[in-house]
């Protein structure tokens, strides 16, 4: 009888070990955004724009785009400019999970999704929503821009 009890305990221990080893942490699938990687100057390299028509995404542009500059500073400011000059705008930035919010002095804000952020690469997605006559919103297009760190 003691042998059966011992075998039962061993089998139970094995089942418990297998059960705990097979469980995974759901947080592992989340993209981890390191805020320190965002600080610095970024130049755009590629831009893809896709519209949403009848519920389907249609790519309208997918090409090199190298004129946009973003500089994120540790004090929470962001300077947007163009390589060729002629445009500069300063905003305040904040980061929560993978959502980057740029708040402008006129009270307007843009919320972008960080699809990827490493020490040298940044991929931002911006959703442009239209206000419909009935007060609802409709997704017009999504612009995904890839940047490389330049300093």
Which stretches of residues belong to each language-model region?
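Bacterial N-terminal signal peptides that target proteins for export
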Residues: 1-10
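C-terminal motif of bacterial Sec signal peptides marking the signal peptidase cleavage site
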Residues: 18-22
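Lipid interaction determinants
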Residues: 24-151
